[in-house]
Amino acid sequence: MKSIAVTGYKNFELGIFKKDADEAVYIKETIKRHLLPLVEDGLEWVIISGQLGIELWAGDVVAELKEEYPIKLAILEPFEKQSANWNEANQLWANEVLEKADYHAFITKRPYESPAQFAARDGFIIDNTDGALLVYDLEKEGSPKFFYDRALQAKEQANYYLECIDFYALQEVVDDMNQTF
């Protein structure tokens, strides 16, 4: 596998409102633990669309991994000015991750017009990656459901790699990191 999309819940869907909240440490560690074996097996690109939450945390993780591994980060935003209505802290976070990217493009080269641009994003990313890693629990629907449904279809039709990190997997990392010996 040469390329993987990483997506999942937006931070506010998880009740997290700061990029560096305590919970983010566990989320980033979980993403890292799932990406690292893929990177060691030859993964070359991680693709995100620059959404708040899981995607930007994944971008931070890839930036850390780039210090030791030949991994690259691509940000394929669904439309221009995606972060225009975000608060200043979130715009800053998005720009910090964008500066670490090896590639950046807009899937539709115009500002937001309709939800169809999100569907276009999902289709383009799935069609141009070998798999997807989602922080998504099937028991708690949210915005990742649309990407998940489309990726599941690709898995069934074209042997697309699909891995979901659910809340149990996140809790295992929390427990592991908090163990005292």
Curated annotation (Swiss-Prot):
Pfam families: YpsA (PF06908). InterPro entries: YspA (IPR010697). Coiled coil: none annotated. It comes from the Bacteria. Belongs to the UPF0398 family. HAMAP family: UPF0398. This is UPF0398 protein LMHCC_0668. The lineage of its organism: Bacteria, Bacillati, Bacillota, Bacilli, Bacillales.
